[in-house]
């Protein structure tokens, strides 16, 4: 049994067949809405949420009321409140969704010098991706990235791998073994690559078909699905894009690629594809824009391009860390949302220097503030909006919002347990800031007489904000994917 086998087996609960999670549940069902449900029980069977009871007095009874054929022995309760049922500042939050992660580039995290996109690809990116044709190197990197993203609460990831067929199959294997929900893509590039890292058109297409078949027929795991991955327009011939488009439509597969990341890149695309009206039009003309297409970056879109993306119902992966690191620009997220375009968050490792979607969300918050400084306050994103992008927004981009993103009946239970008081936590709160509602009311009455007598108390929204700005993987104590525990601190 491998180390990965042990890791996966260790955390899978084999007690009662019906799981009931009890405590405070926080999610964002709509953009701008932060839903907080205290003392709530959520029943999960076979990975699916079967009931949600607010103000629960007895989680086991809730389960037996839901299904009278059950006995107490059939029920396992995960309780983060404790016997005294007092406020402890732990809560369940939906698993994060990373819509853009170059898993193969992880060894280069933090290494980009003073480069911008195109020279960064040549100097740093292509060499490290080529190195992962070595299975031993690839296995070490993939195990690290999957484990690390899970430890940061990321339950769903769209992975870009490399042009190598064997290592892409390995990535799918390890993702299934470790229990992460993933889209796995073999990068396609048959033009404008270095001699040591490029494919011919036939090999690129046929290896993609093999990956799709391998994932669907050999891995055969509902958590692991293929995604067609033309790197970006400059690295793909017209013939290759047309072949990939037919595959996507025939097999109903996701697509992921890059769009409008860098001004020099945009000019290059215009030079390479003079028959197309814009960068977006290249993908549209060659059939790669579908409702299951994920477009990373989209910083410098024109109004016309945004209209096409909306019409084709594509989703956009906002990658604020890498956009800043490579000085690519600031994506106008509010502008996209106002047009009804789906937006999620992407770590974009390795130009993005963190595997954490929470860190990425903080950067999205900051970038929106910088945009507002030269535009209007309307460009600002709130904490709840950034958390929406990190969960439900990402699920929408990946066309998984009917099954992921919130704690609602019928959805998969992809979740993380957050403990703001975890050992070493960077989220500092003082006991006198934290009291029950009746104590808060008493204090408010006292403050009415003397506003300086007692310090202000933290609301639930305040606690979520402190976690958003100061939290990290130390606060993510457990993680579940489809009801199976896949990580424990």
UniProtKB/Swiss-Prot annotation:
GO terms for molecular function: guanine deaminase activity; zinc ion binding. It is an enzyme of class 3 (hydrolase). Keywords: Cytoplasm, Hydrolase, Metal-binding, Zinc. Its cofactor is Zn(2+). It is found in: Cytoplasm. Catalyzes the hydrolytic deamination of guanine, producing xanthine and ammonia. This is Probable guanine deaminase. It comes from Saccharomyces cerevisiae (strain ATCC 204508 / S288c) (Baker's yeast).
């Amino acid at each position: 049994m491998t180390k990965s086998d042990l890791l996966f087996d260790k955390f899978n609960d084999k007690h009662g067949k019906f799981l009931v999670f009890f405590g405070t549940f926080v999610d964002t069902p709509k953009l701008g809405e932060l839903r907080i449900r205290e003392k709530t029980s959520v029943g999960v069977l076979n990975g699916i949420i079967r009931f949600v009871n607010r103000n629960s007095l007895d989680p086991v009874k809730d389960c037996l009321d839901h299904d009278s054929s059950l006995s107490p022995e059939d029920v396992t309760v995960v309780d983060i409140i404790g016997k005294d049922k007092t406020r402890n500042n732990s809560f369940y939050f939906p698993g994060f969704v990373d819509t853009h992660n170059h898993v193969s580039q992880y060894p280069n995290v933090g290494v980009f010098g003073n480069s911008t996109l195109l020279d960064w690809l040549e100097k740093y990116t292509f060499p490290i991706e080529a190195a992962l044709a070595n299975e031993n190197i690839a296995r070490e990197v993939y195990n690290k990235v999957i484990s690390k993203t899970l430890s940061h609460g990321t339950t769903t990831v769209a992975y870009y791998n490399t042009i190598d067929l064997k290592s892409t199959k390995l990535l799918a294997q390890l993702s299934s073994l470790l229990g992460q929900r993933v889209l796995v893509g073999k990068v396609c590039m048959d033009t404008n690559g270095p001699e040591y890292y490029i494919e011919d058109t036939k090999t690129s297409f046929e290896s993609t078909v093999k990956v799709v078949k391998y994932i669907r027929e050999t891995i055969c795991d509902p958590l692991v699905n293929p995604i067609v991955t033309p790197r970006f327009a400059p690295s793909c011939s017209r013939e290759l894009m047309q072949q990939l488009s037919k595959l996507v439509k025939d097999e109903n597969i996701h697509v992921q690629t890059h769009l409008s990341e860098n001004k020099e890149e945009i000019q290059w695309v215009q030079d390479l594809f003079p028959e197309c009206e814009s960068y977006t039009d290249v993908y549209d003309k060659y059939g790669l824009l579908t409702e299951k297409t994920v477009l990373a970056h989209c910083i410098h879109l024109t109004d016309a391009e945004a209209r096409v993306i909306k019409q084709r119902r594509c989703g956009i992966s906002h990658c604020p860390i890498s956009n800043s690191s490579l000085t690519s620009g600031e994506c106008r997220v509010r502008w996209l949302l106002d047009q009804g375009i789906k937006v999620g968050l992407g770590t974009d490792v390795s130009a993005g220097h963190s595997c954490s979607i929470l860190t990425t969300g903080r950067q999205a918050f900051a970038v929106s503030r910088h945009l507002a400084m030269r535009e209007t306050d309307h460009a600002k994103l709130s904490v709840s909006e950034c958390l929406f992008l990190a969960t439900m927004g990402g699920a929408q981009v990946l066309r998984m919002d009917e099954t992921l993103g919130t704690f609602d009946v019928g959805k998969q239970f992809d979740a993380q347990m957050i403990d703001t008081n975890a050992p070493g936590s960077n989220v500092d709160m003082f006991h006198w800031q934290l009291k029950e509602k009746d104590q808060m009311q008493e204090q408010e009455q006292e403050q009415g007489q003397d506003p300086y007598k007692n310090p202000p108390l933290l609301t639930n929204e305040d606690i979520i904000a402190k976690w958003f700005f100061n939290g990290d993987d130390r606060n993510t104590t457990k993680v579940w994917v489809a009801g199976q525990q896949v990580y424990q601190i």
